[in-house]
């Protein structure tokens, strides 16, 4: 089965994905195999429904938000390259990557890109700030009915009050980064991919 995956990916495509995402040859081959097993329509793309069949996403309270991150605006299918680009945000940063070429593009799994990815999970209307309502929606997704609306409102208000530095009653990306400056985002937003 692994050989099927490697034969369908051209060497040049494999090299481009490797360069763009930082995944190893064997990781790309393994993830391609996973991609094709999820591709129920066998058309080389995944739909939202394909993602919803992944048990870990189905039970994750933010599963729908994570699934949405795989799709470009207005798109309802994602190809293998787009799939890999999104997964690259969750690739752990290796020691040898910390001293990468400063003139090259920033790796998709950099702290900055991981923070942008996390910010987009909260910024539901894509206006580059997290409003009280957006924060409430995400909190509601995470805790369900276990906490009253009043308590959730209090948590949202306190969070915005602590993070909002410019007084606009919302959290900008800069404010989001400031709040998370002491959080090990690189570790918390990483998934170990087998080599």
UniProtKB/Swiss-Prot annotation:
InterPro entries: Calcineurin_B_homologous, EF-hand-dom_pair, EF_Hand_1_Ca_BS, EF_hand_dom. Interacts with PPP3CA. Interacts with SLC9A1/NHE1 (via the juxtamembrane region of the cytoplasmic C-terminal domain); the interaction occurs at the plasma membrane in a calcium-dependent manner and at a domain that is critical for growth factor stimulation of the exchanger. Monomer. Interacts with STK17B; the interaction occurs in a calcium-independent manner and induces the translocation of CHP1 from the Golgi to the nucleus. Interacts with GAPDH; the interaction is direct, occurs in a N-myristoylation-dependent manner and facilitates the ability of CHP1 to bind microtubules. Ca(2+) 2 binds at residues 164, 166, 168, 175. Gene3D superfamilies: EF-hand. Changing residue 145 to A: Predominantly located in the cytoplasm. Predominantly located in the nucleus. Calcium-binding protein involved in different processes such as regulation of vesicular trafficking, plasma membrane Na(+)/H(+) exchanger and gene transcription. Involved in the constitutive exocytic membrane traffic. Mediates the association between microtubules and membrane-bound organelles of the endoplasmic reticulum and Golgi apparatus and is also required for the targeting and fusion of transcytotic vesicles (TCV) with the plasma membrane. Functions as an integral cofactor in cell pH regulation by controlling plasma membrane-type Na(+)/H(+) exchange activity. The keyword Magnesium does not apply. A motif (Necessary for association with microtubule and interaction with GAPDH) lies at residues 2-6. The gene is Chp1. Belongs to the calcineurin regulatory subunit family. CHP subfamily. A motif (Nuclear export signal 1) lies at residues 138-147. A lipid is attached at residue 2 (N-myristoyl glycine). A motif (Nuclear export signal 2) lies at residues 176-185. It holds the Pfam family EF-hand_7. SMART domains: EFh. It is found in: Nucleus; Cytoplasm; Cytoplasm, Cytoskeleton; Endomembrane system. It is a lipid-anchor. Changing residue 138 to A: Predominantly located in the cytoplasm. Predominantly located in the nucleus. Phosphorylated; decreased phosphorylation is associated with an increase in SLC9A1/NHE1 Na(+)/H(+) exchange activity. Phosphorylation occurs in serum-dependent manner. The phosphorylation state may regulate the binding to SLC9A1/NHE1. Keywords: Calcium, Cell membrane, Cytoplasm, Cytoskeleton, Endoplasmic reticulum, Lipoprotein, Membrane, Metal-binding, Myristate, Nucleus, Phosphoprotein, Protein kinase inhibitor, Protein transport, Repeat, Transport. GO terms for biological process: cellular response to acidic pH; cytoplasmic microtubule organization; membrane docking; membrane fusion; membrane organization; microtubule bundle formation; negative regulation of calcineurin-NFAT signaling cascade; negative regulation of NF-kappaB transcription factor activity. Expressed in liver and kidney (at protein level). Ubiquitously expressed. Expressed in the brain, lung, testes, kidney, spleen and heart. Ca(2+) 1 binds at residues 123, 125, 127, 129, 134. GO terms for molecular function: calcium ion binding; calcium-dependent protein binding; kinase binding; microtubule binding; protein kinase inhibitor activity; sodium:proton antiporter activity. PANTHER family: EG:114D9.1 PROTEIN-RELATED. Changing residue 179 to A: Predominantly located in the cytoplasm. Predominantly located in the nucleus. This is Calcineurin B homologous protein 1.
């Amino acid at each position: 089965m692994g050989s099927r995956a490697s034969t369908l990916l051209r060497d040049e495509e494999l090299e481009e994905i490797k360069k763009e995402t930082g995944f190893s040859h064997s990781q790309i081959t393994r993830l391609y195999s996973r991609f094709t097993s999820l591709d129920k329509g066998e058309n080389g793309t995944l739909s939202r429904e394909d993602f919803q069949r992944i048990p870990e996403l189905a039970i994750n309270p933010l599963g729908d938000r994570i699934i949405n991150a795989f799709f470009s605006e207005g798109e309802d299918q994602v190809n293998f390259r787009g799939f890999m680009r999104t997964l690259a945000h969750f690739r752990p940063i290796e020691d040898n990557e910390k001293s990468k070429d400063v003139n090259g593009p920033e790796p998709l799994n950099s702290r900055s890109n991981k923070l942008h990815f996390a910010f987009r999970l909260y910024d539901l209307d894509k206006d580059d700030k997290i409003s009280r309502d957006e924060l409430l929606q995400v909190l509601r997704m995470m805790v369900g009915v276990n906490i009253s609306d009043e308590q959730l409102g209090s948590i949202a208000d306190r969070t915005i009050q602590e993070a909002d530095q410019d007084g606009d009653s919302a959290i900008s990306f800069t404010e989001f980064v400031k709040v998370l400056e002491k959080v090990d985002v690189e570790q918390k937003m990483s998934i170990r991919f087998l080599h």
